[in-house]
Amino acid sequence: MAIGDKRKKNRKNKQNKKNKNDNELILLHNTNNKLINSNSLVNSNNKNNNNKNGNGGGVNVMVNQCYNVLNGSFLFGSFFNKFDVLFNYLKSFLTIQKQSLNVNKLTDSNITISQKDNITFSTNSNNNNNSTNGNSNSPSIIIQQQQQHHHFNESQSSNNNNNNGSSLSSLGGSYITVDDLNDQLKIVQLEQKIVNLEKEIQRMRNEQNQIHKQNLNQYHELLKQIINAASLIQQQPTSIIQQPPQPFVAPPPPPPPPPPMVFKPKPIVVQPVSTPSSSSNSLASKKSNGVPQFSISMADITGVKLRKTSSKFAQSNSSPSRVNGSPARNRVVTSPAGIKKSPFKRVLTPVKKSATTTTTSSSSNNATTTTAKGSTSTPLKDITNSNNIKNSVLSPKSITKPNTPSNIIFSPLSNNNNNASPYKPLTISTLR
């Protein structure tokens, strides 16, 4: 494209911008005229003052502020955004004027005002011209608190009724209620508190940073000391650290053994032995109560004589069962007292009773066996192995009488030496 075409386009853009600015200014003048009319209605009693205020700096300040809001890049998209901002600002300004109408209707005669706040809108035209970015500056509100104590006398109260209505007028012709002033004061106080809190937070941060730096310095110093100690240990030869001998500690004594269980000895029941009257009386006199005792006197030993029977069973045609009947019926043992007892009861008798002569059943075990042809039987040996007893060979002819228990059993009380038996009486000495 040629350079001339670019210039033409730039001129057209500039003209469009100027036309937009003119239209915006026309809108602003119309709004200002409406505001002036509203101010004239409010202050109908003081027309001259209201006209001066309307033509004065109040409206011009608003126009300049609106112009500053719109000052900058006048693009088509940003225009509507800035127009909305301006519309909201004007809307809030109109609400303030409506509240001021209610204040002017107060007809109280005695009104004392302790605080009079004037809101002035300052234009920062110099700052806007010097701004390079072209950003719009929001209107700055300066709250001036002027404490003016008006003391009215009773005589002058009637003359100053008209002036009380106009006491709330500001320099710009706008009216602000007392509630709004209180709210603004609270806002200012809150802002001051926020500033103080920010300062305290900053102070706390600075203290924490200092503590952190101190901790870092201590940490680095400790690291240096550790490194120096490690280097010294590596340079020196390693020495075996001998630990001192630990003192000998005796082991604790073992726990005492538990007490033994006490068992009561069971009483030994001794059955009484059936003995002769003379021996039983002597034994009973020697026994103590509850203690079993067993004692034998020499008289008991010498009074007993042990003998061995010499009965032999002959090898004959007749059996003992034919001659004398069954041997089981005739097995009778005579005691020294002359009482007959069976051999089965004799087994259960004590040692003293067992010293008597044996029965035919015991002697039958020692009998010799003979052949059927009548050959001689082998001799019987003495059980006691005594030297005084001779071995004799018995033949069937030597037996004159049949083998009966009466002939075989001898009484121990007989002291005759002319007995048919060749055996001598057995005593304890011979048994040994």
From Swiss-Prot:
SS bonds (residue pairs): none
TM helices/strands, residue ranges: none
Keywords, ordered alphabetically: Coiled coil
Biased composition (Polar residues): 311-324, 383-414
Annotated segments matching region Disordered: 1-23, 37-56, 122-168, 270-290, 310-432
GO CC terms in record: cytoplasm
Coiled-coil intervals, chain numbering: 181-226
Bias-annotated ranges (Low complexity): 37-53, 122-147, 154-168, 274-288, 352-378
Biased amino acid composition, Basic residues: 1-18
Keyword flag Coiled coil: yes
Record protein name field: Putative uncharacterized protein DDB_G0285869
Source organism (scientific name): Dictyostelium discoideum
